[in-house]
Swiss-Prot record:
Pathway: Protein modification; lipoprotein biosynthesis (diacylglyceryl transfer). The keyword Transferase applies. GO terms for molecular function: phosphatidylglycerol-prolipoprotein diacylglyceryl transferase activity. GO terms for cellular component: plasma membrane. It comes from the Bacteria. Catalyzes the transfer of the diacylglyceryl group from phosphatidylglycerol to the sulfhydryl group of the N-terminal cysteine of a prolipoprotein, the first step in the formation of mature lipoproteins. This is Phosphatidylglycerol--prolipoprotein diacylglyceryl transferase. Its EC number is 2.5.1.145. A 1,2-diacyl-sn-glycero-3-phospho-(1'-sn-glycerol) binds at R142. Belongs to the Lgt family.
Amino acid sequence: MLIHPQFDPIALHLGPLAIRWYGLMYLAAFIMFLWFGRLRTRQPHIAAQGWSGRDLDDMLFYGVLGVILGGRLGYVLFYKPDWYLAHPLDIFKVWEGGMAFHGGFLGVVLAMMLYARMRRRPWMQVTDFIAPMVPCGLAAGRLGNFINGELWGRVSSPDLPWAMLFPQAQGEDRAWLAAHAQQAVTSGVQAVFDQYHMLPRHPSQIYQFLGEGVLFFILLWLYARKPRPMGAVSGMFLVGYGVFRFAAEFAREPDNFLGLLALSLSMGQWLSLPMILAGVAMLAWAYRRAGRNGNDAQAGAHA
């Protein structure tokens, strides 16, 4: 049985400025984007498209805006619309937390559409370029969630070797016990609670760090190393992320203000399903288009 170490959310102080771990994770994500982006520009089929270091810097600027604005608005609209409708000024209190990946994803999509229009590049050429780097940001974000002791997993068997006790979850632990009294006794988690005053849970942040982050990055990077039809890498990202996220949600505790929705699926799972369907459609379109044209223009230079 493991106990969450309860890290100080403040990583360091620079005079009056407090630097939080979560902020450092965002910084790490942006640095990894630039690092792997430069590696990607050296791949022959990508170099033929004329990408430069300046392109990376500009995309990062637009991407940061998309992540922050989209992530915040997505959380407001998808998860707590009633609260923010009654307390509209709280929308601007980003330091209190509240970001949604699916909203950040839509924000980045819109930001890249604007970037592609300004640079006169095909939009899918832009999204194909950045897609393999996105899992780096996902990994950094999930690591930040773990350090903060938030977004913990569902109650697990006490026999699970890596089951973890989250002191921050004690309120939800008591609510779970009240709703599942008989199950708590038969599964053995009541005995754990009697001893530690906490319930064993899945460290779902680590699952997502390893799945959506590390493993997904490796698979998508390897797929994108070779020339693919335009739109295929983006489609593969949508399918891959949707599948990884959908699976991880079975171990992640649903938001307590939402719970499980229709078919006992979480909000994260319902939002992932359209991503999977859109990704499959994009892959089918990309390869069908490449078959008709004989040789897709993915590796060609932009106008």
